Amino acid sequence: RRLGTAFLVITHDMKLAADLGGRTVVLYDGHVEEAGDTRALLDHPRHPYTRGLLQSAVGLNPVRDMWGIRPTTVSYTRQPHGCPFYGRCTQSLPDCAAHAPELETQPDGRLLACNRGGVLTLLECRGLRKSFGRQRVLDGIDLTLYSGEIVSLVGRSGAGKTTLARTLAGLLPLEGDGAVEFQGEAADFAALHRRLGGVQMVLQDSQAALNPRMTVRAAVEEPMRLSGCLREGAAERALEDVGLFACDSFLTRRIHALSGGQRQRVAVARALAMEPALLLADEPTSMLDPSGKANLLRMLKGLQNSRGFSMLFITHDLDSALKISDRIFRLEGGKLARLDPNDHIRVHFNGLFDAV
């Protein structure tokens, strides 16, 4: 700056780009995917590839587990005019394989090349309020969930975390002028629970959530049967996805004969069989031992990373939230506040190096 010299840095190091500031251009396969003010790109990436790079950057996320962008899911030679990121993008449409997006200027001044306008807004709620008697539990909650991210909600017991999750799932009615939109339209909760690509919920107590007299197969297939979307082999695939053997002896076992960890995985398989765009997970690990908790969280994060669904993770356990979340909010006094744990961590890292 003192010499007035332009400085062009070509790097894979996202932390270096963040430290240098200025402007950043994101390239993929020789194409500009996104370009703009560095701080704006870091705080709110609009292209799925930019977001994937930031989520993979250890220097920017010193606590979170490393999860790279998924490998390509299609075996094809990309058409000359198709989107270069199509095979790795979790929100791509068939049309993206044939038509490359134009690099267009966005309202905030950045450049973006995406046929879908960038990372999609999946769910948006405005002014959510909920009271039980004279006690106001939710007091004007505003929250936006984007496609392909994990948002964690932490707070004390009784803070209203489950109430918020059940309201977003349509299990509790909206009050006053509160509104919930799903994929840009007013949420029709009955329809969202009964279609593929909608909203599913995993409850804290799998023993209460699953009929103990049902077989494993019947429990996993039940929502698909009720929705008229049962596909051959869907139950087996869902069980294998969550690490359970989909053999006949297990499929015919009664729910009451399963261990706690197995029941919770069956509950997750039941939800994932509906291929949800949004999974609401309310304390899914609270009844598991440390090993079971770690295995279930890594399984959920792995599936989310490869399939691209969004997840709202309700938990008391901030340490677990730090490992898997893209954003974390604390619910207290009926209000949401975003947490930035990296600020605290950077302070302690700096103190550690100062002591050496």
Task: Show where each model-derived region lies.
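Conserved ABC ATPase "signature" region
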Residues: 232-249
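ABC ATPase NBD coupling module
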Residues: 40-45, 76-80, 186-200, 214, ...
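Charged, flexible cofactor/metal-binding loops and thiol motifs
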Residues: 37-121, 340-356
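Catalytic Walker B motif of ABC-type/P-loop ATPase nucleotide-binding domains
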Residues: 279-282
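Conserved structural motif at the start of ABC-family nucleotide-binding domains
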Residues: 123, 138-140
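Conserved ABC ATPase signature
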Residues: 254-258, 262
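P-loop NTP-binding/switch modules centered on Walker-like glycine-rich loops
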Residues: 1-63, 292-356
